[in-house]
Every structure is written in structure tokens, then in C-alpha cells.
């Protein structure tokens, strides 16, 4: 290379732009990842919930995350906080439809029930779970994406089903080992009873307009019941002395509410009647309830629900009674942590350690045979693709939570055997796991027999 060429090359190198590392992207605020370390708690909750729902004869339903916006406007109520301020809504650029990420599950479950005529052959007990979305300020126990478990009893009118859905929650708290969760109940009566109460309530609240906050003033003539649900400390005395809806209930509504109370008492479920409990959704009538804990600060309500008899007809279906509940899973997971409930870590049955090309091939074949037999197996793979030493692999085997390590090297391949080392079964009783040499073609039977024996 000539001197001129050398100088030109050096100049080009100097002017070559520096490549900056790409900025790491982060998740949306208020929408959280569930990481492997959290999985045992979630599985603990989900397994308990599914078992409880099966015990009461509920069937699962799954609905889309996106629904027509009008579904929630009609179903939840136009003057609710959810519809007015919290929904993620957008216009579909393909057809101009107004769509919304679902903020709750009941409206969608009712829509599916009507659309697919699920009540044609009688009442249904349905349950659902999945992510919901609300555009609000993230804080402990309140997120923009959260997960909800819900149950809907459709086509049942009696107080027995109101009581049963409350009992379902209590059974779940017991199964999860949760304590200190208290039940509050109320009755919202029927539409005509609420109208009579509403008239008197508005007159009462008008006398406090000088102290009402902006939210309460906005609701005064549209949804005055929600004013009683205020969290504003300055309005608590006003709300406590307001006309009580229960004083406006007729004989049928009172009989229904008394029936719920009788059944709760018969099943030894303690409760408190809270005349200010109205829930945040417009579709409720008669029974409403909330399960509350003092261990999560301001976000203490972990489940709530009640009866919503008008909703099915309101959404275009044949009139049918209904009731149900929903619970926020993240809040319950947080409560499980607060209670110190620690579910067993989820480990595999077998970790396969190998070294050498022939051993790697045999290990993969052995892993598939063990999986065919119903065992959970992790086959060692190293980050650099070179396998790693037996010592480093055994460290990974121990960290995996496996009950057994199966070890295959060149000597084992040549002899047609494998080494099986116990990692868990006897380390407490005998100071460490034992190791055995096992014929390769007898590995499946050996491990199954060993695991059965260890569980007895």
C-alpha cells in the first residue's frame, strides 16, 4: 500500500461514525411482567381458584380482550368513572368502529351469553379470567393492566345463589390460607325504590354544595348514590348521615336481603351491613358485597360483586336474573405475600447431565423417553454451546430443583449405563443423595420406581 493509500485509509477510519448501543426498551408504566420467580404464587392462586370453581359447578368462558365501546357504555354506565375516565378506547382504522380494551369482565360475559343464546336450556354458572385495562394512575394494587377472576350465575333469582357466590369467595380465602378478610354487604333494592331514595338523597346533598368536591358535584344529579361512596375525608360525616337506601326498600327487596343474611349466618360467615356500599358500576340491584383487607393500604377491596338482574335485558337479551363477583388477582397475590404463604417451588423431576458428542445424543434420546413416561426433564444446554464441565453442570442440576440428576459421559455410553444421583429425596435424612449405576435401557423404570418409593 502506498503512503497516499495508507493516509486515505486512516482518514476513512477516523470519519467512520461510532455505533452506539441500542437503548433498552421498557414496558408500559402500570403494565407489569410476571417473572419466573413470581410463577409459584400465581400458580398457587390459579390452582386453588380452578378447584374451587369446579367444586361449585362453574364452566369457563373466554371472551376477546377488545370489544365494541358501546358494550361498556351500556353495560357499565355512562356516568361511571370507568367509562368517563379510565377506558382505553380507539377507532379501528379499517372500518371506523369504536373499540375498547375491556376494563372488566361481566359485560363481555353477558354479551357472549346473549350472542350465543347460552340460556336457551336453562341457567348457567360461568367463570372467566384474564387481563383487564384501565387508564388510571398506577399505585400499589392498582395497575393499568391487571388480571381479574370472575364468576357469573346467570338465570338464578333467589337469595340462595347470592349467598352461594359469597361462600365461594370464603372457600377460596380458606384454601389460600388468607386471614383477616372481612365481608361487607348491602342491598340496592329495585329501580323504583332507588328512584324514591334518589329524590330524597339529592335534596339532602344540595344542602352541602359548599363542601362537595368536584367529583361529588358532577355526580349530584346523575348518580348521587356514588357520592356516598366518596373517599374524601371531609365528606365522611355528610355521607354517614345521608338518607339510607335500606329505609326505602319494599317488602320483596327486604325479604331477599334477609334471606341472604340468614344463609350467611347458617354457614357461619360473619358480615357487616354497610349502607354506603354501592359499588362502582351502574348495573347492580338488590345484593351487593365487598371483601376487604386492612393489609393492603388504600386498595383494600380484593373482591366484590352482587346481583345485576336488569343487565341482560338492558343489553338486548331476554330478561333473566343474574349475579356474580370479580376479584383482582394482583391484589390477592400481594395479600398472599403479606400473609407469608409460601407455596412449594416448582422444580423438575430429572436434570440430564452429559459430556461428549455421543453422550449428548444419548442424553437427548433418554430425555424424550423420560418425558414419554410423564416425567418433567431438563436437558443441560450451556450458553456457549460447549457443554461445560461435569462440576458446573451438577451445580445447574442442583439449582434447577430436580429430584434426580442423570449423568452420561463417554464411559457410560461405552458401557451402556447411566449414573443416577439423588438430589432431594434423602438429603435431609442421610446427609446427601446416593448415586447408582443403572442400565441405560432400564432408566425409565428405575426412576419411576424410585419416585414412587420416595413418595410413600
Curated annotation (Swiss-Prot):
InterPro entries referenced in this protein's UniProt entry, alphabetically: aa-tRNA-synth_II, aa-tRNA-synth_II/BPL/LPL, Anticodon-bd, Anticodon-bd_dom_sf, His-tRNA-ligase, HisRS-like_core, HisRS/HisZ, HisRS_anticodon
EC top class, as a word: ligase
Disulfide bonds: none
Gene3D superfamilies in the cross-refs: Anticodon-binding domain (3.40.50.800), Bira Bifunctional Protein, Domain 2 (3.30.930.10)
Catalysed conversion reaction: tRNA(His) + L-histidine + ATP = L-histidyl-tRNA(His) + AMP + diphosphate + H(+)
PROSITE patterns linked to this entry: AA_TRNA_LIGASE_II
Keyword annotations from UniProtKB, A to Z: Aminoacyl-tRNA synthetase, ATP-binding, Cytoplasm, Ligase, Nucleotide-binding, Protein biosynthesis
Organism domain of life: Bacteria
GO biological process entries: histidyl-tRNA aminoacylation
Entry's transmembrane regions: none
Subcellular location, record wording: Cytoplasm
GO cellular component: cytoplasm
EC number(s) on file: 6.1.1.21
PANTHER family from the UniProt entry: HISTIDINE--TRNA LIGASE, MITOCHONDRIAL-RELATED (PTHR43707:SF1), HISTIDYL-TRNA SYNTHETASE (PTHR43707)
Similarity remark: Belongs to the class-II aminoacyl-tRNA synthetase family.
Protein name per its UniProtKB record: Histidine--tRNA ligase
Lineage: Bacteria, Pseudomonadati, Pseudomonadota, Betaproteobacteria, Burkholderiales
